[in-house]
Amino acid sequence: MTDAANPPADISALSFEEALSQLERIVQELESGQAALERSIDIYERGAALKAHCEKKLEAARLKVEKIVLGQGGAVAAEPAEFN
């Protein structure tokens, strides 16, 4: 079983878009019900690793986003954005 916290190297090298595309194809294959049991288990595990990778990429992007605020005296500063 693949540890979602430590995805395989081939997944770690994927961009968000590439990982999401692979994850979408896995979901389609699983939903079709046409895959054999062992294949279903294998691609489910890969899908879990891809999901974790996508979440990690999204979190990294979120942390990069900043909001511009006008401070006292008209000073402009950047602060981490809050998405609550």
Curated annotation (Swiss-Prot):
Tell me which Gene Ontology terms the entry assigns under biological process. Answer: DNA catabolic process
**GO CC terms, sorted:** cytosol; exodeoxyribonuclease VII complex
**Database matches in InterPro entries:** Exonuc_VII_S, Exonuc_VII_ssu_sf
Q: What EC number(s) are associated with this protein in UniProt?
A: 3.1.11.6
Which reaction equation describes what this protein catalyses?
Exonucleolytic cleavage in either 5'- to 3'- or 3'- to 5'-direction to yield nucleoside 5'-phosphates
* MF terms in GO: exodeoxyribonuclease VII activity
Locations listed in the record: Cytoplasm
Keywords annotated in UniProt: Cytoplasm, Exonuclease, Hydrolase, Nuclease
Q: Which domain of life is it from?
A: Bacteria
The function of this protein is: Bidirectionally degrades single-stranded DNA into large acid-insoluble oligonucleotides, which are then degraded further into small acid-soluble oligonucleotides.
Q: Which HAMAP family match?
A: Exonuc_7_S (MF_00337)
Return the similarity comment.
Belongs to the XseB family.
Listed under subunit, the entry gives:
Heterooligomer composed of large and small subunits.
**Protein name, UniProt field:** Exodeoxyribonuclease 7 small subunit
